[in-house]
From Swiss-Prot:
Pfam families: Oxidored_q2. It is found in: Mitochondrion inner membrane. This is NADH-ubiquinone oxidoreductase chain 4L. Signal peptide: none annotated. The chain crosses the membrane at residues 1-21, 28-48, 59-79. One of its GO terms (molecular function) is NADH dehydrogenase (ubiquinone) activity. Its EC number is 7.1.1.2.
Length: 98
């Protein structure tokens, strides 16, 4: 169990590093965020099943629902930005520009 937790924490850390490194492109950032959410989902499900905390068994599913909503909104934003500007740079999302 300890090695599985360590692998999931490493996956989360690598996805977080990917967000920090590839923050100029929206698609790369969305993929790294999905990796973070997936590792959090698996880690929460494993911890809940290992400690038999069935009162909080809905928490991973709620996290998965929010992750799906985040992915949907992110992809809609990516499509809108790509059609308007022709690229997926995050700097195009600045709302202060006219």
């Amino acid at each position: 169990m300890m090695s599985i937790n360590l692998n999931l924490i490493m996956a989360f850390s690598l996805a977080l590093a990917g967000v920090l490194i590839y923050r100029s492109h929206l698609m790369s950032t969305l993929l790294c965020l999905e990796g973070m959410m997936l590792s959090l989902f698996i880690l929460m499900a494993l911890i809940i099943s290992h400690f038999h905390m069935f009162s909080t068994s809905m928490a991973p599913l709620i996290l998965l629902v929010f992750s799906a909503c985040e992915a949907g909104v992110g992809l809609a934003l990516l499509v809108k930005t790509s059609s308007n500007y022709g690229n997926d740079y995050v700097q195009n999302l600045n709302l202060l520009q006219c």
